[in-house]
Amino acid sequence: GRQYGLGYGHDLKQVGMNVVFSPVSDVNIEPDNPIIGPRSFGSSLPRVSAMINATVGGFLDAGIAPTLKHWPGHGATKEDSHLHLPSVDATLTDAIHLAPFTDNMLTQKNVNGAPIIMSGHLLAKGLDQNRPVSISKIALTNKLKKELGFLGVIVSDALNMRGITSFL
């Protein structure tokens, strides 16, 4: 993880980049997940969180700002958010999917955390019953920033994805 972030980060730096929309921080617990699959570090929470931590450290050491994605976790869905608006079970979100983000994001207690989080286009009913996370003040401001203490930048996944355009 660290060598990946460091090596990839140095390559990006050489061509003038300073931000990367990586690493995928989803715990892929749904075997039929059509979009996360091999992009994830796996289905084990401790492994995923440790690999995210190492990768973030490598990117930061290379001078690249990494992005944790797809908050609050897209690994339990059976739908592709490029095509549909997936939903995530609230208990899974809290118990499994938040940890790779909360363990590795920029906060007052973790000044070496990732400074960017990309929100996923999904309905996380435990956060907001009515709006996808990517356009939810409850999920982004109340939960991510205020409750969890994220101090960095929040970006949205692509706005041409059906997961969000079908909702708007």
Predicted feature descriptions by range:
Residues 1-28, 48-72:
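Glycine-rich, aromatic-flanked loop segments that form ligand/cofactor-binding clefts
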Residues 36:
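Active-site-adjacent helix-turn-beta-strand microarchitecture at beta-sheet edges
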Residues 40:
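Conserved beta-strand positions that form and line the central face of beta-propeller blades
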Residues 43-168:
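Second-shell residues forming the walls of enzyme active-site clefts
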